[in-house]
Amino acid sequence: MITYEEYVKQLKELDVYSTVAFKRVVPYVLIQQQQNEDELLLRLRAPSEKLVGEINNGSNKLVIIDLKISYSHVYQEPQLSIQLWETNGRQENQEEEQVDEIYLWYPNNINETLAIPTNLFTIELDTVPRPRVERTTTDNINNSGSKKLMSSSAWYVVHSCDTSEIVGTPIQNYLQRWASVYIASWWGIVRTPNNC
């Protein structure tokens, strides 16, 4: 376990790309990184040779993977959430340059799709709250004053149970060790799914 305060401190220092395992599998391109006090979102694009492969009648491909690191107050552990985005490769306007549409993709078996060993940890589809932009009375949308509105979206969530047993209990570099296990250990092995 790690306290929220220690988690926030280590999150500021976390460099997922510095883990040894991640350095070996650099084929994924970081296209966006957002960080606030207690969350880190990495949006990665898979290069063409690492695409999961053809799915849904041979036309769709995985193109973007979002990894969100947050804190589970219930388990007092870091939590990894995953979203997959696919493209259908369809041209919207044949006369102009090709524009791919991208969609959230929820494969039947996330472990198989991302080649994550099922004995490593449990992954389940769940809704994850996300804060929306604060609105004030000047927005003419929310007349009740300044409120932080919440919405939620579906993510694959890696269950936080047994994290201390997997990562080890020393607090020093806890989050870096966690990232090595929960992200870098499986990240380099994306393959074609058999059952989507």
UniProtKB/Swiss-Prot annotation:
One of its GO terms (biological process) is protein transport. E2-like enzyme required for the cytoplasm to vacuole transport (Cvt), autophagy and nucleophagy. Acts as an E2-like enzyme that catalyzes the conjugation of ATG12 to ATG5. ATG12 conjugation to ATG5 is required for proper localization of ATG8 to the preautophagosomal structure (PAS). Likely serves as an ATG5-recognition molecule. The active site is at 161 (glycyl thioester intermediate). Keywords: Autophagy, Membrane, Protein transport, Transferase, Transport, Ubl conjugation pathway. Its main location: membrane. Forms homooligomers. This is Ubiquitin-like-conjugating enzyme ATG10. InterPro entries: Atg3/Atg10 (IPR007135). Its EC number is 2.3.2.-. It is a peripheral membrane protein. It is an enzyme of class 2 (transferase). GO terms for cellular component: phagophore assembly site membrane. It comes from the Eukaryota. Pfam families: Autophagy_act_C (PF03987). One of its GO terms (molecular function) is ubiquitin-like protein transferase activity. It is found in: Preautophagosomal structure membrane. Belongs to the ATG10 family.
